[in-house]
Amino acid sequence: MRRLLFATLLFPVAAAAQDHSMHDMPAQPAPAPQEAPVDHSMHDMPAQPAPAPQEAAMDHSMHDMAAMPGMGANAVGGSGSALLPAAEGAMRGFHATTTGNWMLMAHGVLTGVYTDQGGPRGDDMAVVQSMAMLSASRPIAEYARIEFRAMLSLEPAMGRRGYPNLFATGETANGRPLVDRQHPHDLFMELSARADVDIAPGTSLFLYGGPVAEPALGPSAFMHRRSARYLPLSPIGHHWFDSTHITYGVVTAGAKTDAFQFEGSAFKGREPDEARWNIDTPRLDSWSVRATWTPSPHWTAQISHGRLKEPEVQHPGEDEARTTASLHYARGGLSAMLGFSAKNRLPGDTLTAWVGEANWDLSRHHSLFGRIENVANDELFPDHADPLHDRLFRITRFEAGYAHRIPLGKAAELALGGSLAAYAKPAALDAAYGKAPISGTLFARLALGQ
């Protein structure tokens, strides 16, 4: 019988009596019966606390997130400057309003994962995935706001080779290509700042970037999408859609209305190197543009194009022209995404990928999720002596799973679940991968917020 390992996760939740609900505000002492209620509209900043000995008490309201840069009536912020449907809800976590009108937010995810990837080229492994995000935002003028963001991960501790993930490619470890494995994230996933200035009712300009940030290319990264919330492993199409979500050197400028956002970025095209604990030298040698349409709180669509200078160390001298399009939907407990990407190696072939994924919260405790991917990959056999070296194969991956959610107060959650994955592939791969490999994954996901 195969060994099954779950990490025991302990997460301190301070001040358990505090209310972090998206809808329930902590009761405030009213100075008079006729006092007007606080306005939490999308356009008003949080009201100043009345002078009192309790003035410094922290406000843990989830509605205050609406005042953060990048949000509007129809959209909320995803990763970088990307947008998602407002019906997904703002990112949740621990919030506090301090003196100086700074709004602080802390959000984190710690996931113990055991995966058994099937077939002759599969492997099994237990790993811990992690992400912690801190942000601070405040108004700097009547019509201007600023935000600072930091996102960190301890995944480099799992080693350069990462974890098994059948048909995943695109990185190296110890100078050798990683095949059928997913690399760990860097320690520094984001160190960025953003400034927004309102120029007309419902219209603003923004500037975003930093030494570690995300350019305006592709959809919101998979770990920030509600449609991928409980999917335990990275998508095998990661290098088609959101491989730029950790980029060393980004400057983005854009304009936003309630229905549209247009933006352009200058950034470093080369993906992070194998040294995951440090910050690579920032550079601005690549560019991208993105247009996003948010017609209602339930729909978001984006199309983007970028020119990346030598993004992958495995393909020296090759630039990449990448085009992506995605459609996102959210209503009630359902979040879904459909995406397409084409990366054209210059010089070289154009490789395309499709992805469809969804998460459905059936109730407060039960969720179903799934993802279907179809990618054209020519990196499965890096050995030049292999007869299948540089051959292009189209792979389809089907994954579905279930999560049992256990609320821990109003701002934390433990989710226990698992998924199964099957694959459709050309017969030429049977000798290497087996005729019908099946992969299984179990996870325990502890989240502060989201």
Report the location of each language-model feature.
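Repeated loop/turn-to-beta-strand initiation elements of outer-membrane beta-barrel proteins
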Residues: 104, 142-146, 201-205, 259-263, ...
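Residues that define the transmembrane beta-barrel architecture of outer-membrane proteins
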Residues: 102, 124-132, 185-191, 245-251, ...
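Outer membrane beta-barrel transmembrane domains
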Residues: 304-314, 335-348, 352-359, 365-409, ...
